[in-house]
Amino acid sequence: MTAQQLDASGRLRHLLTLEGLPRETLLQLLDRAGQIRDAAVGRVGNKRQVLAGSAVCTLFFEPSTRTRSSFQLAAQRLGADVLNFDASTSSTRKGETACDTLRNLEAMGVRGFVVRHPDDGAVAALAEAAGEGTALINAGDGRSAHPTQGLLDMLTLRQAKGPDFSKMKVVIVGDVKHSRVARTDLHALRTLGVGEIRVCGPQSLLPDDETLKGCVVGDDFDAMLEGVDALMMLRLQRERMEEGLVPSLEQYHAQYGLTNERLARAGKDAAVLHPGPINRGVEVTDEVADGPQSWVLRQVANGVAVRMAVLETLLG
């Protein structure tokens, strides 16, 4: 898939996954996003019109609030016209395929597509069907990838703990097995050379494939917290309880919920990240979510800057 994302000169053509992308490409995107964020270009009233005259479509086949809104703001602040496609009210309900939808919108002059889909590989399949000069961005597909979330998480880590990823110890906590965010972050952490990657969660929620290769893996949260610089807490999907993978929300919180008492075991000023939406009282307490070590809202703010950087790189 790496070759599919890059053109013959090595320039990014689509952003489908972080897996296999060169370290230099990730750092270039992070550097550009950092410049945008530092200059406060991502704020209302301070726009860069590099995409004026271009059209971007958010093509979402799954519900989303933060990701869709973030991409919409990013595109608008670069001067693009934005179309919001809603599968529930579109011609796909009449039998039109996603590829036909893409081609029809291309014919109208849309150059950029931000796609979320419930199926693994669906965005890559659309990229294969896209015409020359059209760019696709994966806004989350199945369990496999959510590249802009991974980039904004890496930008937040760099802001919180400095530019030297090799000195960081990071723990990912929760339902790694079903999480596209976790898989994406693991690819990014490895590519950027993070010193130690720990993964913690119930055995029923940890993958048994190559996903965790090279990671320190365990189910004792208190032990895994010792000396970490950052914690990446994952959302527990309620359906996991219905599937019997988690006995109860209360028991999950007792074993894997982040409290101030547990946070004290981590390294000094350890940063707390969460992709949202947060289940308060399950993954984290109110005190942690709203506390001084929470970087959650800064992740959200960084998301706009990251998505501006990606859109600018692909379409600018």
UniProtKB/Swiss-Prot annotation:
Function: Catalyzes the condensation of carbamoyl phosphate and aspartate to form carbamoyl aspartate and inorganic phosphate, the committed step in the de novo pyrimidine nucleotide biosynthesis pathway.
PANTHER family in alphabetical order: ASPARTATE CARBAMOYLTRANSFERASE, ORNITHINE CARBAMOYLTRANSFERASE, MITOCHONDRIAL
Entry annotated with the keyword Transmembrane: no
Entry-linked Pfam families: OTCace (PF00185), OTCace_N (PF02729)
Protein name: Aspartate carbamoyltransferase catalytic subunit
Entry-linked InterPro entries: Asp/Orn_carbamoyltranf_P-bd (IPR006132), Asp/Orn_carbamoylTrfase (IPR006130), Asp/Orn_carbamoylTrfase_sf (IPR036901), Asp_carbamoyltransf (IPR002082), Asp_carbamoyltransf_Asp/Orn-bd (IPR006131)
Protein family per UniProt: Belongs to the aspartate/ornithine carbamoyltransferase superfamily. ATCase family.
Single GO cellular component term: cytosol
Pathways per UniProt: Pyrimidine metabolism; UMP biosynthesis via de novo pathway; (S)-dihydroorotate from bicarbonate: step 2/3
Catalytic EC class: transferase
Quaternary structure note: Heterododecamer (2C3:3R2) of six catalytic PyrB chains organized as two trimers (C3), and six regulatory PyrI chains organized as three dimers (R2).
GO biological process: 'de novo' pyrimidine nucleobase biosynthetic process; 'de novo' UMP biosynthetic process; amino acid metabolic process
Catalytic reactions on record: carbamoyl phosphate + L-aspartate = N-carbamoyl-L-aspartate + phosphate + H(+)
Binding site for L-aspartate: 94, 180, 235
UniProt entry keywords in alphabetical sequence: Pyrimidine biosynthesis, Transferase
Source superkingdom: Bacteria
Encoding gene (name): pyrB
EC id: 2.1.3.2
